[in-house]
Amino acid sequence: LNGETEIDYQGEPSRVQAIQNTAKAHVYGFESGIEIDFSVALRLTSQISITEGKEEQEDGSTAALRHAAPVFGNTHLIWHKKRLKFDLFAEYNGQFDYEDLAPSEQGKAYLYAIDDNGNPYSPSWYSLNLTGQYEFSKNLLATASLENITDQRYRTYSSGIAAAGRNLILALRYTF
């Protein structure tokens, strides 16, 4: 655009604007998973993800990267025999203290829990869940899930949405 600050757009003068990433960010992490078969019917699976991120600020200093989540993972104990399957599983998330939050998040008390000093932080949480499935036929599957059995109040990092309390889900699936 040859450095122009305005262009003609459909007969109207329009200001030229650009969103630019002018700083640097460094993100690194580690993800690991394991599967253990105790028997033909019983299996344990677990996954964990650890992410760290730093971004350069306008003054040249570094601070926590907004979208680098705290440690999170899940663990499943699955029993599956013929047409019946049970999955007892936990989902979990680590804590971010006020100092661990990105500067852009530190002023958002409405989005996070408040610590003893009155500062926002993202507390750790877990949910314990149980799902059962029965395959009546090749085409018909029934599922029942009880989620958040311990009725924990939790919020996925930076989502702003608190999870529902205990849930019961019943479903029938028929495939043509």
PLM region spans:
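Outer-membrane beta-barrel transmembrane domain signature of Gram-negative proteins
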Residues: 19, 118-121
